[in-house]
């Protein structure tokens, strides 16, 4: 334990709201949850919890921007826990908690001037709230085992001397990139997957749930690039959708058809593919890819991309199938404005029509969830953070 005089000194330096010996501070630097916890334990005491005696001080520091607090999903107990060791109980203001799972931590923000708890991937970069207690001091030397995630057990295959692995833990594209670079080489670069043997090996670790790969639209050059910087060739079987800034690529498979590339909002939470190349090694210090027309340090996970187009298509030799050619976001937006608005239970709604080209062997009703996901990604680029819900009504066959 540090001398009390020293403890009082370090707390006084962080003091923003003084009323009792337990004080709170908002740190605006964006860090992952774990890095935020380490920062709080080094400079203060720990990430903030929601003790009733300190709620009024927390409230005065809160903003509409979500900030990390000490609450996280403990994978070892499959429940919520405070990083300080306190037992989690119901919230003072009676809010229904969002759904938490492995790899998710809690944020605190204001919504309509009321405090709200949010859930986000623990790897996301966010500001955070620390508390300072002079009777406890720094906790940097006290490192309890926090099971934010279960030990990753990826599906692994070897292709052309490279190791590919699929992780089911969900992250944003940027967070997955940083994870892959720190522990392996990078997000999956498929330039070496050129023959049927390689494709079949890759298929063995794929699923219908799309997972991030390293292909993205370089905002500086306007061309497709691999985040690994090992080249720019794209295998002929890898049919890439139309891309715009703010969209990244994910790989999935439907039934027995060829692997399909999806364009997805880069801030979405998806599983991901990493690869390891022994001749390259880790790339933890590599420069971040230019997803937007900003410097790498300005690229955040909260950036709202510009309107664009999302298209998904796949193919393999003569077995090519163009699927889910999603409509352009700007077209959808302008067309929806021409539709007659109506009110139902106080909520406005509009009717959108999207054209898709699929094989006659595929049932559109079975694929409606995939279609809706792609339309949703396009609308997110147009509507930003506005809340909306999509409902599948029907489909019709274009006989032209």
UniProtKB/Swiss-Prot annotation:
GO terms for molecular function: carbohydrate binding. InterPro entries: C-type_lectin-like, C-type_lectin-like/link_sf, CTDL_fold. SUPFAM superfamilies: C-type lectin-like. Disulfide bonds join 40-130, 105-122, 180-274, 248-266. Residues 1-20 form the signal peptide. Keywords: Disulfide bond, Lectin, Repeat, Signal. Residues 287-346 are annotated as: Disordered. The keyword Signal applies. PROSITE patterns: C_TYPE_LECTIN_2. Residues 26-131, 159-275 form the C-type lectin domain. This is Putative C-type lectin domain family 20 member A. It comes from Homo sapiens.
């Amino acid at each position: 334990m540090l001398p009390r005089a020293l403890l009082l000194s370090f707390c006084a330096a962080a003091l923003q709201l003084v009323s009792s010996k337990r004080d709170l501070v908002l740190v605006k630097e964006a860090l992952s949850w774990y890095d935020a916890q380490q920062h709080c334990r080094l400079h203060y005491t720990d990430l903030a919890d929601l003790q009733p005696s300190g709620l009024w001080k927390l409230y005065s520091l809160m903003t509409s921007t979500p900030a990390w607090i000490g609450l996280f999903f403990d994978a070892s107990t499959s429940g919520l826990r405070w990083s300080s060791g306190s037992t989690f109980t119901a919230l003072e203001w009676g809010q229904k908690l969002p759904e938490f799972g492995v790899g998710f931590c809690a944020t605190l923000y204001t919504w309509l001037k009321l405090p709200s708890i949010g859930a986000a991937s623990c790897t996301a970069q966010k500001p955070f709230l620390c508390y300072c207690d002079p009777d406890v001091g720094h906790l940097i030397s006290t490192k309890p085992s926090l099971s934010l995630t279960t030990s990753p057990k990826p599906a692994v295959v070897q292709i052309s001397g490279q190791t590919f692995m699929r992780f089911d833990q969900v992250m944003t594209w940027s967070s997955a990139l940083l994870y892959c670079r720190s522990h392996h080489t990078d997000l999956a670069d498929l330039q070496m997957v050129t023959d049927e043997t390689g494709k079949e090996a890759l298929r063995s670790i794929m699923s219908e749930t799309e997972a991030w790969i390293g292909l993205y639209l370089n905002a500086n050059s306007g061309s497709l690039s691999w985040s690994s910087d090992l080249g720019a060739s794209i295998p002929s079987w890898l049919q890439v959708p139309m891309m715009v800034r703010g969209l990244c690529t994910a790989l999935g498979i439907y039934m027995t058809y060829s692997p399909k590339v999806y364009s997805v909002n880069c801030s979405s939470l998806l599983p991901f593919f990493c690869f390891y190349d022994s001749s390259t090694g880790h790339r933890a210090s590599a420069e971040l890819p230019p997803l937007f027309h900003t410097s790498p340090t300005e690229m955040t996970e909260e950036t709202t991309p510009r309107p664009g187009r999302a298209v998904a298509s796949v193919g393999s030799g003569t077995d090519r199938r163009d699927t889910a050619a999603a409509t352009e976001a700007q077209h959808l937006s302008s067309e929806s404005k021409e539709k007659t608005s109506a009110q139902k239970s106080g909520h406005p709604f509009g009717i959108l029509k999207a054209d898709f080209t699929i094989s006659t062997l595929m049932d559109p009703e079975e694929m409606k969830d995939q279609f809706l996901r792609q339309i949703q990604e396009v609308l997110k680029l147009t509507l930003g953070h506005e809340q909306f819900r999509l409902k599948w009504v029907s489909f019709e066959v274009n006989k032209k």
